[in-house]
């Protein structure tokens, strides 16, 4: 077993060796390196064919028509293109958008930008388990609501929203529905031929593909329109200009092809490992599960260890690559906004660790993790005056702390 153990698959994944091998065939002079927009020679035609195959592989995994797949530089761009693109196109109908407080920053900050441009945004608070109450969503819908953006799987706590039900509600009212599926695609079944979802964002690097490539699904029937945010040569049906990075697209396509083949068995394996990890640590005193195992993605476990500071715990667990919060915001020392939205106090939010498992995680690694976590929590609590006071029965909330 190699140390450190990588348990941060929700931040990024290694590229699958099969994907890396494929990418290499589309880079050099003796490979297929042409520009797919070059219509006058074989180099361009071969590149275009490779892009078409990848587009089909991505559409295949999610039950879409390949013509509905628009390539972008990643899920952040897909979220921006979907939300700004739809808001700008449909603003004559209304200027009200609904999202949730636990969305990824790529959705929240895009909505904040639209607020500065005169749109009105309602941010729904989830229930304690992280799930959005559909009655609250319905109550928030107005005549001038043009867009709802609610993610499929949360990147920090792994809860799965009922996107099928939300889609039905939106379609019945003629509201565009965008789903950020970055954390769910290839891990949970998605069938866009059945779901009433209009726009869906995908990433390459969360599913063993390369970084820097993503896609946006844009429904054709009933037709959904978006305004381009990137202008140039009119690539991708005019929705996203820019020369297509064939090697990255081929890598993403291959990753999605593999995911389709292996998803069912991999889901069960990961769920087993996640449950093994939780069962191994849940009897530690003052341990809280954030989210909901029953309505949760099979690969994410978010746990708070009371009376232990999250940053010091991460230092103590130096043999494990884990995170407190998401990688995109873990550079700041603010407690996770997702956990705060669930109603956790600052202390519990600060003492949270996200374990995210993946294709190369083994049972041996999980057992080592359990042992290490148990040891580290014990050691850190031995050093903690707060833990000592708690064990003596002192109500820590009633203490007036001196402010210097």
UniProtKB/Swiss-Prot annotation:
The modification N6-(pyridoxal phosphate)lysine is found at residue 206. It is an enzyme of class 2 (transferase). [2Fe-2S] cluster binds at residue 328. The gene is iscS. It is found in: Cytoplasm. It comes from Escherichia fergusonii (strain ATCC 35469 / DSM 13698 / CCUG 18766 / IAM 14443 / JCM 21226 / LMG 7866 / NBRC 102419 / NCTC 12128 / CDC 0568-73). The lineage of its organism: Bacteria, Pseudomonadati, Pseudomonadota, Gammaproteobacteria, Enterobacterales. The active site is at residue 328. Signal peptide: none annotated. Homodimer. Forms a heterotetramer with IscU, interacts with other sulfur acceptors. It catalyses: (sulfur carrier)-H + L-cysteine = (sulfur carrier)-SH + L-alanine. One of its GO terms (molecular function) is cysteine desulfurase activity. This is Cysteine desulfurase IscS. Belongs to the class-V pyridoxal-phosphate-dependent aminotransferase family. NifS/IscS subfamily. HAMAP family: Cys_desulf_IscS. It comes from the Bacteria. Its cofactor is pyridoxal 5'-phosphate. Keywords: 2Fe-2S, Cytoplasm, Iron, Iron-sulfur, Metal-binding, Pyridoxal phosphate, Transferase.
């Amino acid at each position: 077993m190699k140390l450190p153990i990588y348990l941060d698959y929700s931040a990024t994944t290694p590229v699958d060796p099969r994907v890396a091998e494929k990418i290499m065939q589309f880079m050099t002079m003796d490979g297929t390196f042409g520009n797919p927009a070059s219509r006058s020679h074989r180099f361009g035609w071969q590149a275009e064919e490779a892009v078409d195959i990848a587009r089909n592989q991505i559409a295949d995994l999610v039950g879409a028509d390949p013509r509905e797949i628009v390539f972008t530089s990643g899920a952040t761009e897909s979220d921006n293109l979907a939300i700004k693109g739809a808001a700008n196109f449909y603003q004559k109908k209304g200027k009200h958008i609904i999202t949730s407080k636990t969305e990824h920053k790529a959705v929240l900050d895009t909505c904040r930008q639209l607020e500065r441009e005169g749109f009105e945004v309602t941010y729904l608070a989830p229930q304690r388990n992280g799930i959005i109450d559909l009655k609250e969503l319905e109550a928030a819908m107005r005549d001038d609501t043009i867009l709802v953006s609610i993610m499929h799987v949360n990147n920090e706590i792994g809860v799965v929203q009922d996107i099928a039900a939300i889609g039905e509600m939106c379609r019945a009212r003629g509201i565009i529905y965008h789903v950020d599926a970055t954390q769910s695609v290839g891990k949970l079944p998605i069938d866009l031929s059945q779901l009433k979802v209009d726009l869906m964002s995908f990433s390459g690097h969360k599913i063993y593909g390369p970084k820097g490539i993503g896609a946006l699904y844009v429904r054709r029937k009933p037709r959904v329109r978006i305004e381009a945010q990137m202008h140039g040569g009119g690539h991708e049906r005019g929705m996203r200009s820019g020369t297509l990075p064939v090697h990255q697209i081929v890598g993403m396509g291959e990753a999605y092809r593999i995911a389709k083949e292996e998803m069912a068995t991999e889901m069960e394996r990961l769920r087993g490992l996640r449950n093994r990890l939780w069962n191994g640590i849940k009897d530690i005193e003052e341990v809280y599960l954030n989210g909901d195992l029953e309505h949760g993605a099979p690969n994410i476990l978010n746990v708070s260890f009371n009376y232990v500071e999250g940053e010091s715990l991460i230092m103590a667990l130096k043999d494990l690559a884990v995170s407190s919060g998401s990688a995109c915001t873990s550079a700041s020392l603010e407690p996770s906004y997702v956990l705060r939205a669930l109603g956790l106090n600052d202390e519990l939010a600060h003492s949270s660790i996200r374990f995210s498992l993946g294709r190369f995680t083994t049972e041996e690694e999980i057992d080592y993790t359990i042992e290490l976590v148990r040891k580290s929590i014990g050691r850190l609590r031995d050093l903690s005056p707060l833990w000592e006071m708690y064990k003596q029965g002192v109500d820590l909330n009633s203490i007036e702390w001196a402010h210097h």
